[in-house]
């Protein structure tokens, strides 16, 4: 039975109201009236408010909250509104307002609406942050009045006032962008304390708690708002602990903490030449400014750059009444995931600290206990927490990351957001949630990011049992996978080493948001402090970066650039291996092995394959590459570069050099006859590996000088003189003639085959002989021959004539005729412009986007590094065009050539075979243009398969 209540033009409906006891029903109706009278509320979800207890629900025969609200009038616009309140069963926002309220603010509003215990607060919108930046980094007109009005609501709800010693209200001020950026922006806790307020708080809640909160606030406010290094406060704390002969800050007495507060206040004067601001309203204004400022901090900008986060207006600011986990042994704080973010296992995964505040867990300041300890010491709060987790998973239909505090045995929910997860975790969670009926396969495809698959394709240790004797310490397995590198102790060094091509293991006592660049550059991360939900762990998991945290056995000395494990000393530059799955720290350079595809991943990829339209092929030059590609789900070979086969042995490269030195076609044919068996053998292996799938083989493309060594030629010249009978002077002269001013636009591609038809003849003969041989062995062969660097239809016509002539001869000699295709690479802009002419000659087009990008931009791929970073930093380019397809320029050539080619030849097959074939946003563009396939490296095939599916769903 459905009951309804009409209030000021909005019809509120609850599917369960008639089932509730009468007194609960009356209470809810009163709440709903108050909700609908609240000004500018966009819409409200009528769900069980926080004040309806679970026992009342259970006594009515109901499960925890699932009531719904269907608004029948259009929602009130929130375009002009900049401050939104929430708490105690009501809110002015909802989870769909992330772009305006940030992820944290939207989810606080949502948790409030569904009846969870959320401390009242207000969210200042991201639009206000944008206005702040545009207003010269000062609060825009009228905003402080709106904040004050929101604060009045919080004070009324909490029956407390900011700055009132008799009824003290303390606040947290936190950032929250629309996209999660763990640790990148600022937080201030316990705001509102001064000497008078702390005395009042001490009278109500105890002196130790009050002064512990005060010293934390002085530290955090000083660092975040005043720019005082945290280390200056930490020095005072460590000095006092040493004087008292204690190890934990929890062992400090109230008198100790009171003394520490005075020392902290002196830090302000020593570091800034000014006193700590005691006016709570001024503290709040400064804190809001600091959070807005942190949006534009170097670490936040770097994080957004690394993760390609663009288009956001700014960060929201969440001002919330404080609840305290540091009020003794009946209080605590924790962070959890509703499923294991590393493995995906359906089990609560998190950490808990008794008598602590949330930043102690998240910042890795103290190494916390496993969440299971909470069940033992606070069973009622733990039971409610488990129920809340189930409610949130059902509501959001996703794995959630939750922060909570227990204050004197009462649970408070401080944050929920979609949890960051590893590749392994993402795939298992997606598959399990489909099996549980929470989501469908299309939603599952959207849930797994292409970066997640990239992580799954990273190597693991070849033989974990082989290194057991080299394990010197074990920390927490914070982010799975394996990492091998040389030890470094600063983020700056890690970035420098990475730029030099060195593999670094970043070793820190604990990481901070300032380390984000070095963390991204490092192969792996090792920290002495911090738990599974510390900054290092969360950021590393988000990137699929191997991380071992909370390794209490190590002592890090940044000044000496060493760390010690007992008597053992590990220096900068020493090789170290990390197992992020087990937490093992291993001396030396351990061997890595390629990863294997799990059953969950196979199931997930089958859903992606059913959804996508675009075929995914691979660039593979050897039988092993082809086998890897097939195992990774490739539907054929889109590019086999024949020149790579020439470097496989000394005999092959010698034969190539003889061919290059040849003066007459006859001499050249003798050398090519030596190469033919090698090429035929390689093609046979590739055809065998790709049985039943197309194999596109590109004829010789690079300039001939690339097959000659650089530097000292004397040894090679002498060798060639013996092999060819030419004099040294003749060989030097030949080499000199081969050198070009601009070789990438010189004597290469089809120009070689036209100038030396015998070169094309040899390669094509090897292809067709291998194809017939494999066919005779029962292998289904689908050969496709690709002519490179065509700029005119006449060039392609010439090479097709040579190819068809050789094919006819081989088929006649071997008594077998096969179907085959001949096509071309479109990599010269002119070819794209006259694609209708070239399309009449070709069976297929394959866009060589690497060269097409070079020639369209006029950038040399080998030299672009000299200015590319400047262009990216100044916004001249948004992306590296050799990584992400330039849709406005190069992309338009691809679109035009596809349309023109198909107009001339409706059966024309069209694909791409450049590096862009494995880049997700480029794959989306190629699908939109209507290409038939993309081809990428074997290890990126699963990524391209998923990207192609995500375009459709």
From Swiss-Prot:
| Gene Ontology CC terms | chloroplast
UniProt entry tagged with the keyword Amino-acid biosynthesis: no
Q: Identify the InterPro entries for this entry.
A: ATP_grasp_subdomain_1, PEP-util_enz_mobile_dom, PEP_util_AS, PEP_util_C, PEP_util_CS, Phosphohistidine_dom_sf, PPDK_AMP/ATP-bd, Pyruvate_phosphate_dikinase
Q: Where on this chain does Mg(2+) bind?
A: 827, 851
- Please give the residue positions where the record annotates the modification Phosphothreonine: 533
Q: Where does substrate bind?
A: 641, 698, 827, 848-851
Q: Which cofactor does it need?
A: Mg(2+)
Q: Does the keyword Ubl conjugation apply?
A: no
Q: Which reaction does it catalyse?
A: pyruvate + phosphate + ATP = phosphoenolpyruvate + AMP + diphosphate + H(+)
Q: What is its EC number?
A: 2.7.9.1
Give the region (Disordered) as residue ranges. 55-74
The molecular function terms in GO held by this entry are: ATP binding; kinase activity; metal ion binding; pyruvate, phosphate dikinase activity
PTM note says: Phosphorylation of Thr-533 in the dark inactivates the enzyme. Dephosphorylation upon light stimulation reactivates the enzyme.
According to its UniProt entry, one GO biological process term is: photosynthesis
Q: Where is the transit peptide?
A: 1-77
Which pathway? Photosynthesis; C4 acid pathway
Active site residues of this protein: 535, 913
Q: Which domain of life is it from?
A: Eukaryota
Subunit comment for this entry? Answer: Homotetramer.
As a miscellaneous remark, the entry gives: The reaction takes place in three steps, mediated by a phosphocarrier histidine residue located on the surface of the central domain. The two first partial reactions are catalyzed at an active site located on the N-terminal domain, and the third partial reaction is catalyzed at an active site located on the C-terminal domain. For catalytic turnover, the central domain swivels from the concave surface of the N-terminal domain to that of the C-terminal domain.
Show the domain comment.
The N-terminal domain contains the ATP/Pi binding site, the central domain the pyrophosphate/phosphate carrier histidine, and the C-terminal domain the pyruvate binding site.
What name goes with this protein?
Answer: Pyruvate, phosphate dikinase, chloroplastic
Tell me which species this is from. Flaveria trinervia
């Amino acid at each position: 039975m459905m009951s309804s209540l009409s209030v000021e033009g909005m019809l509120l409906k609850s599917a369960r109201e008639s089932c509730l006891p009468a007194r609960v029903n009356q209470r809810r109706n009163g709440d709903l009236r108050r909700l609908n009278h609240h000004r500018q509320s966009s819409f409200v979800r009528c769900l069980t408010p926080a004040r309806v207890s679970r026992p009342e629900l259970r006594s009515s025969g109901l499960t925890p909250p699932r009531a719904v609200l269907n608004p029948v009038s259009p929602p009130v616009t929130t375009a002009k509104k900049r401050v939104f309140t929430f708490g105690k069963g009501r809110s002015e926002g909802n989870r769909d307002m992330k772009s305006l309220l940030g992820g944290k603010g939207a989810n606080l509003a949502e948790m409030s609406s569904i009846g969870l215990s959320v401390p009242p607060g207000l969210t200042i919108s991201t639009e206000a942050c944008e206005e702040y930046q545009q207003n010269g980094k000062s609060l825009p007109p009228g905003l402080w009045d709106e904040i004050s009005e929101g604060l009045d609501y919080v004070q009324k709800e909490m029956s407390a006032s900011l700055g009132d010693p008799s009824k003290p209200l303390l606040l947290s001020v936190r950032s929250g962008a629309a996209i999660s950026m763990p640790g990148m922006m600022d937080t201030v806790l316990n705001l509102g304390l001064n000497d008078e307020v702390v005395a009042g708080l001490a009278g109500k809640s105890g002196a130790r708690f009050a002064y512990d909160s005060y010293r934390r606030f002085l530290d955090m406010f000083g660092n975040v708002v005043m720019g005082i290094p945290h280390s200056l406060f930490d020095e005072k704390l460590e000095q006092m602990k040493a004087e008292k002969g204690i190890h934990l800050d929890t062992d400090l007495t109230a008198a100790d903490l009171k003394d520490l507060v005075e020392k902290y206040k002196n830090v302000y004067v020593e570091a800034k030449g000014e006193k700590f601001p005691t006016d709570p309203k001024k503290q709040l204004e400064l804190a809001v400014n600091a959070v807005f400022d942190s949006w534009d901090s170097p670490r936040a900008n770097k994080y957004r750059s690394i993760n390609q986060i663009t288009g956001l207006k700014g960060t929201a600011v969440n001002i919330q009444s404080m609840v305290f986990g540091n009020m003794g042994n009946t209080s605590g704080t924790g962070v959890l995931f509703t499923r294991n973010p590393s493995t995906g296992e359906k089990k609560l995964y998190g950490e808990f600290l008794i008598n602590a505040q949330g930043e102690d867990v998240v910042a890795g300041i103290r190494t916390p206990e496993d969440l299971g300890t909470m069940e033992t010491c606070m069973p009622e709060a733990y039971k409610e927490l488990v129920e809340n987790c189930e409610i949130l998973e059902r509501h959001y239909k996703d794995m959630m990351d939750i922060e909570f505090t227990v204050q004197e045995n009462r649970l408070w929910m401080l944050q929920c957001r979609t949890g960051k997860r590893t590749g392994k975790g993402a795939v298992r969670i997606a598959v399990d949630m489909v099996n549980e009926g929470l989501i469908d396969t299309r939603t599952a495809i959207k849930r797994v990011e292409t970066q997640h698959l990239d992580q799954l394709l990273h190597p693991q240790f070849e033989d974990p049992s082989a290194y057991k004797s080299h394990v010197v310490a074990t920390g927490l397995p914070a982010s799975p996978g394996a990492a091998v590198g040389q030890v470094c102790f600063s983020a700056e060094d890690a970035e420098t080493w990475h730029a030099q091509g060195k593999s670094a293991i970043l070793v820190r006592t604990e990481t901070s948001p300032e380390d984000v660049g070095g963390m991204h550059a490092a192969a792996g991360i090792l920290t002495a402090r911090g738990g599974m939900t510390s900054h290092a762990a969360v950021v590393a998991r988000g990137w699929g970066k191997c991380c071992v945290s909370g390794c209490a056995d190590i002592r890090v000395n940044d000044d000496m650039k060493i760390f010690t494990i007992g008597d053992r000393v590990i220096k900068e530059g020493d090789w170290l291996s990390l197992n992020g799955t087990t937490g093992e720290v291993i001396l030396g350079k351990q061997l890595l092995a390629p990863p294997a595809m799990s059953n969950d991943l196979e199931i997930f990829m089958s859903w992606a394959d059913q959804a996508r339209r675009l075929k995914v092929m691979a660039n593979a030059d050897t039988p092993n590459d082809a086998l890897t590609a097939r195992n990774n789900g490739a539907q054929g070979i889109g590019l086999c570069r024949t020149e790579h086969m020439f470097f496989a042995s000394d005999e092959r490269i010698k034969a190539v050099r003889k061919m290059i030195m040849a003066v007459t076609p006859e001499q050249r044919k003798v050398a090519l006859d030596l190469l033919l068996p090698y090429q035929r053998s390689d093609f046979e292996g590739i055809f065998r590996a790709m049985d039943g799938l197309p194999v596109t083989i590109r004829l010789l493309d690079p300039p001939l000088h690339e097959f000659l060594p650089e530097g000292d030629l004397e040894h090679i010249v002498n060798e060639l003189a013996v092999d060819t009978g030419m004099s040294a002077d003749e060989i030097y002269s030949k080499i000199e003639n081969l050198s070009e001013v601009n070789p990438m636009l010189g004597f290469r591609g089809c120009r070689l085959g036209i100038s030396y038809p015998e070169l094309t003849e040899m390669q094509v003969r090897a292809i067709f002989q291998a194809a017939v041989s494999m066919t005779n062995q029962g292998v289904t062969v689908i050969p496709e021959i690709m002519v490179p660097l065509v700029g005119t239809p006449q060039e392609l016509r010439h090479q097709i004539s040579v190819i068809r002539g050789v094919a006819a001869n081989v088929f006649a000699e071997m008594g077998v005729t096969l179907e085959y295709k001949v096509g071309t690479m479109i990599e010269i802009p002119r070819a794209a412009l006259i694609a209708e002419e070239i399309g009449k000659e070709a069976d297929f087009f394959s866009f060589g986007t690497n060269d097409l990008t070079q020639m369209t931009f006029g950038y040399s791929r080998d030299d672009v590094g000299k200015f590319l970073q400047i262009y990216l930093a100044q916004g001249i380019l948004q992306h590296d065009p050799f990584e992400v397809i330039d849709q406005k320029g190069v992309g338009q050539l691809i679109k035009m050539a596809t349309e023109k080619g198909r107009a001339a030849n409706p059966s024309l097959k069209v694909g791409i075979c450049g590096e862009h074939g494995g880049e997700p946003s480029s794959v989306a563009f190629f699908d939109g243009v209507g290409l038939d396939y993309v081809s990428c490296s074997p290890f990126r095939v699963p990524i391209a398969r998923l990207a192609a599916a995500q375009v459709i769903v």
